[in-house]
Amino acid sequence: MNHEVSSKNVRKENVNKDNVNILKKSNKIIQALDLPTLCNLNPRSVYNKVDEFHTFVEEESVDLLFMSESWEREHLTLDKIIKLEDHTVISNVSQRKGQGGRPAIIVNHKKYQVQNLTNSVVQIPWGVEAVWCVLTPKNVKHDSVIQKIACCAIYCKPNSNRKTLLLDHISDAFNVLSTKYGRGLHFVLAGDTNDLNLDPILALSPNLQQIVKNWTRMNPPALLDPIITTLAKFYQEPLCLEPLDADPDKNGVKSDHRIVIARAINAINNKCGRKTKQIKVRPFPQSGMEKMKSWFIDKSWEDIYELESAH
């Protein structure tokens, strides 16, 4: 018993330091601690889903939400119906005629300083459905890799005749903000892009990546709700959750778009759901086993025995 205790209590000076592995904390994880939980949501009108929306944001601890089809109304704007104590609503109700569309950004102002850039630093052409803001983490330091995050929520209706105008706008805004803020600026763009070609956006920087991998609408299957960001390496693979349902007391229908959630990497849970694939094999019958046995017995192995080396 005494021998066992003494062997476990090894004196510090007897430890060979050459055999000690020092585990360094990942800088990527440290930097990701300041990143928001992202959500890309197309509610197909949030007005009959307000309670469900509030519950979802609170339960999932969403910090930065991109809403594509809010269907905002001029006489009842989003900031009058969305009542999340810690969140700021950024929208632009005067960006189109008629019902539908009208993207918005809802962001946690307790964690980030929020500056609305819509039609101030970034001018939005008429008919382009986009809103912009820039976030600054409240504990940012002068040497932080992530100084600011420029955010854009977009909506491009199917077969839109303003696709080129939208792409030109995003390119112009990207260049304006990159020049204005410089080092440490990152981008997140999300929304419902339908049949918009995303390649011109991705070509703006080699660091921009589209990180959503699964269908976001199931009938018919399509990936319509991308998240494009320069922060891809700091995020886990996004999850696609069930569409937002209408409030029980409202006369509404469930959205047909799944909700996309992207969480920053951390030291505890960086694994996506288990992926499986089906592998089909042809069974080897007993008759085949007997034939193989006979072949081994009848085979002359002299050429093998005469080899000087297996190599």
Where on the chain are the PLM-derived regions?
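Short phosphate/oxyanion-binding micro-motifs
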Residues: M1-R183, N194-Q209, N214
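Short, Asp-centered acidic motifs that coordinate Mg2+ and/or phosphate
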Residues: L64, H186-V188, P226
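Proline-centered loop/turn at the N-terminus of a beta-strand
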Residues: T88, H186-V188, I259
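Active site of divalent-metal-dependent phosphoester/diester hydrolases
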Residues: I90-V107, G184, N197, L204-K233, ...
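Conserved beta strand-loop-helix elements of the APE1-like EEP
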Residues: K97-N116, L135-K138, C156, T193, ...
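Surface polyanion/phosphate-binding segment centered on an Asp-His-Pro turn
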Residues: V134-I149, L231-H311
